[in-house]
Amino acid sequence: GVLLIAAAVFAAALLGIFTRPMGLLASFWPANPVLLALLIRRPGLSTPAGWVSACIAYLAADIITGANIWTTFWLTGANLAGVASGFLLFQQLPRADQRLRRPLSITYMFGICVIATVCSATVGSSVTKILYDRELLTGFAFWFTGDLVNFIIVLPVALTMPSRARLSAAIRNGWRQRASWDWFPAFAFILSLAGSVVVGGAGAFAYSVPALLWCAVRYDFFYVACCSFLYCALQTMIVSSGWYFSFVDGDALNSIMSVRLAIVLIALGPLSVASINAARDELISRLEHAVRYDFLTNSLSRREFMEQATNTLAERSLHGKGTAIFLVDIDHFKAINDRYGHGAGDRALVAFASRLAAILGRAVLG
């Protein structure tokens, strides 16, 4: 666990360092949300050794790239302050909200990220004044908007990422089963990103909004989070580099902060839609299961059994295949209810259904 934290934070910090424009802090800093997501998904990593390994990883990434040692300690303290406050607040949420599976989960996440970035900006804003001779309030605002963007675009991906086996299976099934028109939102999203770069202009970062919303109503939450991540990371770096428009002398920081906040608000739209869709799909799945299966034995309900049996018989008859049907009865079941009560009868039914399912499963498997 300690090595996992150190490796993840070190790699993410190096990536952020390489995105630093001249004279500014990193335009994309994934180390903080990556560390926060690791701790949320695996709370057992939140140990003194885990926090020390994260601190060492932050320091090592800055030092090997030539940063001043005292500045590095200050920046690391600011980063850890934001992550620690965010982790403590996320621990107060139910597990479903931590994995962004409820309609209000994105709202909770946004509020926690705001508080976490306020904590980190309070500690780190002085660095901006020392390094770049900016006003303290300007340094606070610049740090706050930058860190907030990083949290909003990275956390949803990291918190909803499925396991490697489930992700591989989902990708394979998606290629086999997804209808061709289901790829249209992804194509529209890619084209909108390319169009924003080619056309340019002050409003180019907003060109992908319709495509992102289309993806949000068509795809699972994790894939929507990936699209949002790609959009926001790309737009943040392009805006910070001045590709879309030239900054007015002396007003570059204000322009960058304004666009960063706009990107955050844009990202919240499709993420909220995807979160609501995920909650709706889960509810529909539970309702369908309640209709199709008996709540006690988890076997097919009478109506579902009759429908499936009728369809199976008709299909096998159409292909000239025979069908064997057997009926099973529990002897003296009424006596169990009369003598021991309906609770004992329910337990007997559950045990019988489980035993029957196990026997039939073995028979099917050979």
Task: Identify the residue ranges that each predicted region occupies.
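Hydrophobic transmembrane alpha-helices of multi-pass small-molecule transporters
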Residues: F151, T236-V239
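Signal-transducing coiled-coil linker helices
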Residues: Y207, A252, M257-L296, R303-E315, ...
